[in-house]
Amino acid sequence: MSDIQLNTLKPAEGAKHAKRRVGRGIGSGLGKTAGRGHKGQKSRSGGFHKVGFEGGQMPLQRRLPKRGFTPLGQHLYAEVRLSDLQALPVDEIDVQTLKAAGVVGQAVRYAKVIKSGELSRKVTLKGLTATAGARAAIEAAGGSLA
C-alpha cells in the first residue's frame, strides 16, 4: 500500500476518452456531414421537433382528458402532529409559534392538530383546532384548547 501516493494516481486504462471533434476534416472520420448523415430535418441546424411532437399525430398529452385541480386555498391549511407539539420548547402554542419553529410554512393561516405520535406534557393551544382523538390526548396530558 505504500506504493500509492496522491501524485502517482492515474485513471484506469481506457477510462478516459478524447472529446469528439466533429466537422474538422476528412481525416478525423467525422468531417463533412459530422455524423448527421445527408439531408433531412435532423441534419440541419435548429432542425428538431418540440417535446411531445408525434409527427402530426395528436400528441398523448392532448389525447388524454384534463383531470382534477389544485384548490387555491390549499397552502393556507396545515396538519400538525402531537409529536410536533411534544418537540416544541413552549407551552402556549398558536400558529405564529408553529411558523417560528418551522413546523408549518409561512403561508399557513389555519392549523389542525391530528392524533399522530405521543404527547406527555401539558400544552395550551390558542387558535388551533384539533381532531377528537387529538383533543382527548391533549386533555389527558393536562393540556387545553383555548
Swiss-Prot record:
Keywords: Ribonucleoprotein, Ribosomal protein, RNA-binding, rRNA-binding. One of its GO terms (cellular component) is cytosolic large ribosomal subunit. One of its GO terms (molecular function) is structural constituent of ribosome. It comes from the Bacteria. Residues 1-65 are annotated as: Disordered. Residues 24-34 have a biased composition (Gly residues). GO terms for biological process: translation. The keyword Transit peptide does not apply. The keyword Membrane does not apply. Part of the 50S ribosomal subunit. PANTHER family: 50S RIBOSOMAL PROTEIN L15, LARGE RIBOSOMAL SUBUNIT PROTEIN UL15M. Binds to the 23S rRNA. Belongs to the universal ribosomal protein uL15 family. HAMAP family: Ribosomal_uL15. This is Large ribosomal subunit protein uL15.
